[in-house]
């Protein structure tokens, strides 16, 4: 039996593509464009795992498909190479993070090339290259000039173990850091912020213009968190102080019986009475040790302290005790709430715990037993009594505005983006602080502001980054003799990844971020493939920066990514014990088809789980490529199931994909290829071209491969294979298995040219129609023969064909035929005696 030798074929074609620059981005202005983008990877020390190639293979198939359809294709790759892991490694080993990063990139690139992806490597970007981050810094200076980058003393999520502050989005639901799982505490610090809130409404509205999964759009909508309601001003009794509350339900103001301020609210110290001062100070201290997520956990016990002061309810003049509680955040809304315990579960629990008044203002429910959170007509509400929700809100807003104690307002959950990191391995923020108290951006002519090489990269512990230790870089003097210090904070890893897709369009431009005409030609990105875990962070930040650049006239589109696709996760083989705990694969043995814990002897259940080093179930693509070949890995990952499903890795599935490719190889290299078409494969060939073309376009790669298998099965039943169909089939399979595709194309054509730009096959609509049908012949109600006949034969013709059949004649010999019932295209029933 013939098998193809992937160890010879694959390196041969990879060298051919590299030597001939086969995948150089097309520039023919008469052709349509297609920009296929992968989320570029962080080049970790671990290298690629088999999850990476799933998305990369999908965009590669589309890129190869579109090239064959006559598109200019931009399909680039690069490296998101700043960030904490390299710095952590450098601190642990004493090595330079730049060296570590360069080694990792070389390894990633080797692995990627071994998989046969059609990237245009002339467009490679690296976020740590000064020629790249010059433009990251340039964008920052533009944000600064527009007032969208500013410094503020803000409570930050401080991670002591990392020596840096992190963004809200990087805090996990359990209150630990996304990177490393360390405890997060709140701590006030001077930080750089980006005013993403200025774009909240546009970030929300323009989601309607993009073809993204609805689940991702919803996550962004929820993160932006638009609320329509009213601001209400409360005066503090016996003082000249007041505070503002935002509420979506101003109609329930008659039911507001107490107010709660965030412990960090600026008014707290000013209104706290002397006998409550100690309790308030103690509570503030405790609150500062908790993350926002821990503080707002609905399940946690309600805690709080009374300030000793009262606010006056503007609508009825009643006194409301003012409390502080950690479930109110200074960073959300106004940092103050009016509590309506009769109609809000959290307020109700708090009121019950601290014995505060509960006054129902909506009809229905028993507020002594639980908060009534449904809608009802208003009661106990003076001029709102008897009104429904919408009417009451409108009337209350009108009253608040007339009385000068409130106004209609829209607020957003979205907070400004905490942009500074107290670390070394990031882009230096191009700002100088002068001793006269002013700050200026580094002029464009002096960019890039290069990150200085230093051995001392441990966090300073003072809240400044290690750059504070590099004095010859840090200290500067202006022409007029005024001394200054450079900003020591660096940018977060999200900075370089917020605009990299633009640099791919014009990566070697030294004069500007990218040429306007090229940006017009290539934007927006046609397909962006990556993990759903980036739904809020990267995708929201990139959209924000893109809109700023749109306002500056740098980019021609409002949105960066027209279509987004999230691939599923490839799960590893893993095992669970009776408690549900996962057991590492090296602690498992197989006996008689069952799995047992090596140490305890307990029988284990096999269950897929995320691949991880600790479970020792990570599959390295290098091993798969060596044993089965890159084409097998590509076909297997596309055939596992729908691209967006999470599916368990299977060696059997891998072997099945290899066997299929061997059958393809045998079909083309051992079957007699003929210039004459017998017509036997007309229907299945044209069906295959139609199905594969449509399914690749829709990213239904698993069903496209299934159809290719149908063709192979049909072709194997024939003695000869029509050469046009052989070539067309090889073209169809080439995007999935490109090395094999090239090899078989040469076997058929000996052209010496790559298959990559050969026009995609077309199908003949008329050949899709079935010209023959199978009918059954029944005698005494039992099927005695099956006949393939021309479609739409008349009753008489059908009867004639059936009675002429040898099997039928043997059955009816010597018998009397009573009658024959013929149903065109279905059956012939013969009644005999």
Curated annotation (Swiss-Prot):
ATP binds at residue 613. A motif ('KMSKS' region) lies at residues 610-614. It catalyses: tRNA(Leu) + L-leucine + ATP = L-leucyl-tRNA(Leu) + AMP + diphosphate. GO terms for cellular component: cytosol. It is found in: Cytoplasm. GO terms for biological process: leucyl-tRNA aminoacylation. A motif ('HIGH' region) lies at residues 41-52. It holds the Pfam family Anticodon_1. GO terms for molecular function: aminoacyl-tRNA deacylase activity; ATP binding; leucine-tRNA ligase activity. Its EC number is 6.1.1.4. PANTHER family: LEUCINE--TRNA LIGASE, MITOCHONDRIAL (PTHR43740:SF2), LEUCYL-TRNA SYNTHETASE (PTHR43740). Belongs to the class-I aminoacyl-tRNA synthetase family. NCBIfam families: leuS_bact (TIGR00396). This is Leucine--tRNA ligase.
């Amino acid at each position: 039996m013939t098998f193809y030798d992937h160890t010879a074929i694959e390196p041969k074609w990879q060298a051919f593509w590299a030597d001939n620059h086969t995948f150089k981005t097309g520039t023919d202005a008469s052709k349509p464009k297609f920009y296929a983008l992968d989320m570029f990877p962080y080049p970790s020390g671990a290298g690629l795992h088999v999850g990476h190639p799933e998305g990369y293979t999908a965009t590669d198939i589309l890129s190869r498909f579109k090239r064959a359809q006559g598109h200019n294709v931009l399909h680039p790759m690069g490296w998101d190479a700043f960030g904490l892991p390299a710095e952590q490694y450098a601190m642990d080993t004493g090595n330079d993070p730049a060296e570590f990063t360069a080694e990792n990139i070389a390894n990633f690139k080797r692995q990627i090339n071994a998989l046969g992806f059609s990237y245009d490597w002339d467009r490679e970007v690296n976020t740590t290259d000064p020629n790249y981050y010059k433009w990251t810094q340039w964008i920052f200076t533009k944000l600064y000039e527009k007032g969208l980058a500013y410094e503020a003393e803000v409570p930050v999520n401080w991670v002591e173990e990392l020596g840096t502050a992190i963004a809200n989005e990087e805090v996990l639901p359990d209150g630990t850091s996304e990177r490393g799982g360390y405890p997060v505490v709140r701590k006030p610090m001077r930080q750089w912020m980006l005013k993403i809130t200025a774009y909240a409404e546009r970030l929300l509205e323009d989601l309607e213009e993009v073809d993204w999964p609805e689940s991702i759009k919803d996550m962004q909508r929820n993160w932006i968190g638009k609320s329509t309601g009213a601001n209400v001003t409360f005066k503090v009794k016996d003082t000249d102080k007041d505070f503002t509350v935002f509420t979506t339900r101003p109609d329930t103001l008659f039911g507001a019986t107490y107010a709660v301020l965030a412990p960090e609210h600026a008014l707290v110290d000013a209104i706290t009475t002397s006998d409550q001062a100690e309790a308030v100070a103690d509570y503030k201290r405790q609150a500062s040790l908790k993350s926002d997520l821990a503080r707002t956990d609905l399940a946690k016990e309600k805690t709080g302290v009374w300030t000793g002061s009262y606010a006056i309810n503007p609508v009825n003049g009643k006194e409301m005790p003012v409390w502080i509680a950690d479930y109110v955040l200074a960073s959300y809304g106004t940092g103050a709430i009016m509590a309506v315990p009769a109609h809000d579960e959290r307020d109700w629990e708090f009121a019950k715990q601290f014995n505060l008044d509960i006054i129902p203002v909506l009809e229905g429910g028993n507020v002594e037993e639980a908060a009534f959170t449904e809608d009802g007509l208003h009661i106990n509400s003076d001029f709102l009594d008897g009104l429904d929700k919408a009417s009451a809100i409108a009337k209350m807003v009108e009253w608040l505005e007339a009385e000068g104690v409130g106004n209609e307002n829209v607020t957003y959950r979205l907070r400004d983006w905490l942009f500074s990191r107290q670390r070394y391995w990031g882009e230096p923020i191009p700002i100088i602080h002068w001793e006269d108290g002013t700050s200026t951006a580094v002029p464009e002519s002096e960019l890039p502001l290069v990150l200085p090489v230093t051995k001392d990269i441990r966090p300073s512990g003072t809240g400044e980054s290690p750059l504070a230790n590099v004095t010859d870089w840090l200290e500067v003097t202006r022409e007029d003799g005024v001394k200054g210090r450079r900003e020591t904070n660096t940018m977060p890893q999200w900075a370089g990844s917020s605009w990299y897709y633009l640099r791919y369009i014009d990566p070697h431009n030294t004069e500007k971020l990218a040429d306007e005409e090229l940006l017009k030609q290539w934007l927006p990105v046609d397909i962006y493939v990556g993990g759903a875990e980036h739904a809020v962070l990267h995708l929201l930040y990139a959209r924000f920066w893109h809109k700023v650049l749109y306002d500056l006239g740098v980019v021609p589109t409002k949105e960066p990514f027209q279509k987004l696709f999230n691939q599923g996760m490839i799960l590893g083989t893993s095992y669970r014990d009776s408690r549900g705990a996962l057991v590492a694969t090296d602690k498992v043995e197989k006996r008689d088809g069952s799995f047992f814990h090596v140490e305890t002897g307990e029988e284990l259940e096999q269950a897929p789980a995320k691949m991880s080093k600790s479970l020792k179930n990570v599959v390295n693509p290098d091993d798969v490529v060596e044993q089965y070949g890159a084409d097998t890995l590509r076909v297997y990952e596309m055939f596992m199931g729908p691209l967006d499903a999470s599916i368990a890795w299977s060696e059997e599935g891998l072997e099945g994909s290899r066997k299929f490719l061997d059958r393809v190889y045998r079909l083309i290299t051992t079957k007699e290829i003929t210039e004459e078409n017998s017509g036997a494969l007309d229907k299945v060939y044209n069906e295959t071209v139609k199905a594969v073309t449509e399914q690749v376009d829709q990213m239904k790669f698993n069903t496209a491969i299934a159809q290719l298998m149908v063709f192979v099965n049909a072709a194997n039943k024939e003695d000869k294979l029509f050469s046009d169909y052989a070539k067309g089939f090889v073209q169809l399979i080439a995007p999935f298995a490109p090395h094999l595709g090239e090899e078989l194309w040469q076997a058929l054509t000996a052209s010496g040219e790559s298959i990559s730009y050969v026009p995609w096959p077309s199908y003949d609509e008329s050949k899709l129609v079935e010209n023959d049908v199978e009918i059954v012949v029944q005698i005494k109600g039992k099927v005695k023969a099956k006949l393939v006949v021309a479609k739409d034969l008349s009753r008489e013709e059908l009867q004639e064909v059936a009675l002429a059949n040898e099997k039928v004649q043997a059955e009816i010999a010597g018998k009397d035929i009573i009658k024959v019932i013929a149903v065109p295209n279905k059956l012939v029933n013969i009644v005999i005696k």
